[in-house]
Regions:
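N-terminal secretory/targeting leader peptides
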Residues: 1-187
């Protein structure tokens, strides 16, 4: 999502300052020649408001939550995934839970929670996109499947970079790819 005009090709990101939510997105932006600026959402809003940032990677729900939508006039809709959400419990607290609570958490947590949470997140994002379209103020561009395929070598390079720099990354990447394939084939 950006406040300044980006044409249909992401090559136009070259030499632009684009907010990144983290290292993986930054690496992807850098593959287009952008200057990736890693920052939190409130800082992103401040920089967008001052016109010192050319654009940002941020999901629709984050844009709404942090009241960033008023700061943009264009949305380049890319399926870049979402930042993982973890709900953690320390071992002492876990051990104090009754067995029925543990069973309920195990039954409704993990993959089940991820699937339902992901669906809810996607639906909320789609609703925000519909609201933006109805408002008519924000120009939305959604690249075609063919355009997305042209980005695939960059995506693969970033995935390889992550796997190389992450302890046990190559094994994790194989497991992630297998899980994604399984989830996608069952939906």
């Amino acid at each position: 999502t950006t406040i300044k005009e980006i044409n249909v090709a992401l090559k136009d990101l070259k030499n632009k300052k684009i907010r990144s939510p983290g290292a993986v997105h930054a690496k992807w932006l850098e593959s287009f020649g952008a200057s990736a600026e890693t920052m939190d959402s409130p800082e992103m809003n401040e920089m967008l408001n001052r016109n010192t940032l050319d654009g940002a990677i941020q999901g629709a729900t984050g844009m709404k939550t942090y009241k960033s939508l008023a700061l943009i006039n264009q949305d380049y809709h890319l399926p870049l995934g979402v930042i993982p959400f973890l709900l953690l419990i320390n071992e002492k607290t876990w051990s104090r839970q009754p067995d029925d609570v543990k069973a309920a958490m195990l039954k409704r947590g993990g993959e089940v929670s991820a699937i339902y949470g992901g669906k809810a997140y996607e639906e909320a994002g789609q609703q925000i996109q519909q609201e933006l379209k109805a408002e008519g103020r924000v120009k939305t561009t959604t690249p075609s499947a063919a355009q997305l395929m042209t980005y695939e070598p960059r995506n693969q390079a970033v995935q390889q970079w992550w796997a190389d720099k992450t302890p046990n990354g190559k094994t994790l990447m194989v497991e992630i790819q297998a899980q994604l394939k399984s989830l996608r084939s069952s939906s």
